Amino acid sequence: MLKYASIALALATLGVAQQQQWGQCGGIGWTGATTCVAGSVCSVLNPYYSQCIPGAATVTSSSAPSTPTPPAGALPRLGGVNTAGYDFSVATDGSFTGTGVSPPVSQFSHFSSQGANLYRIPFAWQLMTPTLGGTISQSFLSRYDQTVQAALNSGPNVFVIIDLHNYARWNGGIIAQGGPTDAQFQSIWTQLAQKYGSNQRVIFGIMNEPHDIPSISTWVNSVQGAVNAIRAAGATNYLLLPGSSWSSAQAFPTEAGPLLVKVTDPLGGTSKLIFDVHKYLDSDNSGTHPDCTTDNVQVLQTLVQFLQANGNRQAILSETGGGNTSSCESLLANELAYVKSAYPTLAGFSVWAAGAFDTTYVLTVTPNADGSDQPLWVDAVKPNLP
């Protein structure tokens, strides 16, 4: 497992430039300002990142700050893994051929025994409703629900994200922009809300990785319609609101975020409307390479600033990951340490991926046949579970 050296920040002399609230003020390799403007405290969040957090005076800290009090109704700190399989063969244009593969249910108890408390279970729209806008397939729902229940039963505090994994599309057409109508999109969520609305540990992942959306404002209206439909069905679950550009955490503050923060909850308040973001660590942010080139801390810092400035909202990093390589073991550990330290603004993470992926998959965290874990899980994920 990775070992971190402790960081001690020295008091800077007067006259040195000061960092603004929420700006970086220290960390391994940091060469900028190490004092904060009046009213902020330079606090160590992890060995690579210290931040100017509003406080009583400008001081430095050699240990992480106490965890902020979560707002009423906030999600608890979460950490876990995507258990893929029912999404296999969904293309990025929303087309699908296949039957899906059931994730091994033994993985849930395996990971939960180590502290995981979040499982994201993706599925193809076409498997759940073979006819667009039609009724849910009871045979598939029974199969899918067995997986959901196995995850929930693996621990009393485990949450499950049911993830519609279709890229805001059905067979090439974008929702409300030449493809499925808003009513057809709402139909599947109405039915899923009727199924899972009684269990508050089921989080509704409204859509995986919308991308190349001609009108983001139209897409946000579609998201609002899904929220309204879920609430009209009587469900009070937490909802994950997806942005654009493949749910990019980097694009969120300037692209979809300013519109998504205006989505309202018929229940009142915003504590159950959580933003859904993704960020990989390879050279092109695609999650297709075994090596990592960034820990995304600066990207996530900007996201945190945006969320705190817009109503102290929460987000989940529901996809991130890397290969079982030394670069990813180090950089993913840094990223997840920051996510954990940024609670409650960042509610948690789920790494990609286990489930029906075999151990040769480039981003696998699927346990080996002998029950041992992948190096990435041992060195980067497990130390940062809740």
Curated annotation (Swiss-Prot):
Keyword tags: Carbohydrate metabolism, Cellulose degradation, Glycoprotein, Glycosidase, Hydrolase, Polysaccharide degradation, Secreted, Signal
Signal peptide start-end: 1-17
Localization: Secreted
Glycosylation sites: N324
Enzyme Commission number(s) from the entry: 3.2.1.4
Catalytic activity: Endohydrolysis of (1->4)-beta-D-glucosidic linkages in cellulose, lichenin and cereal beta-D-glucans
Annotated active site: E209, E319
The family this protein is said to belong to: Belongs to the glycosyl hydrolase 5 (cellulase A) family.
Official protein name in the record: Manganese dependent endoglucanase Eg5A
Organism: Phanerodontia chrysosporium (White-rot fungus)
Name of encoding gene: Eg5A
